[in-house]
Amino acid sequence: TVESELKLGLLGTAPTALYRHATGTGHLFARSNWTRDALWMGFVAGRYDQSHAHQDQGAFTLFQRDFLAVTENIFTHSGIQQGAEVHNVVRFTSNGTTVRQREGTTSTMVVTPGANGALTVDADLTPSYNGNAAVGQWRRRLDFNASRLRVHDTFTIGAGVQATFQVNTPVQPFVNGRTATAGSLLVTVIEPADATLSVLDWRTQGSSEYTRGWRLDIRGSGNAFVVELAEAGALFGNGFD
């Protein structure tokens, strides 16, 4: 069958392109190579113009042989959880309430390819908050290569607003200082130096809706996050044991 031939790699040569930036929808898809063991990333920064669309501007997905980091929405009963809480973004909260991204806005990203599948992304997610004083600015830079994704966030926020870097995972994260391991995913917080990491079991938010999944929450002082995400085996294979 075609499916079997695809799995066996019998349908000709692999494409040369390693990323696709769909500018009309604001979606980026990138992979480190065309082997089964490739590190794959998805990212969103573009038009938010549908009432049923998700508040996922600035969200990333990471995959290597299986999902490493992915929206919690895929593990819900309804499949229609749209809030920022279920996506891999910086979540801004004011008085305990998540600051919403707004329909009718357009975020932007600039993609710069490098060698051997590496690329950088510079995204301005500020427009998605439509002038809300709670979020004066949010920019996200991604540095992607065959072994890891580095995420660098800078932001300005209003008084009383808290920023949380969040990573939704299919398996439970275990925290050790400023690192966390969730199955094959290793998360390392580089900034802020005083970062605290905590874990949410989504089933505690209603097991009839949230059937599985966890969220790693990273908080700290300052107006920036720098976080690296990698497949742990790749790091160990390079001698980081």
Language-model features: locations:
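Carbohydrate-active enzyme catalytic cores, enriched for enzymes
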Residues: 1-69, 214, 219-220
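CBM-like, beta-strand-rich accessory domains located in the C-terminal region of large
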Residues: 74-233
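Ser/Thr-rich, Pro/Gly/Ala-heavy low-complexity intrinsically disordered linkers and tails
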Residues: 235-240
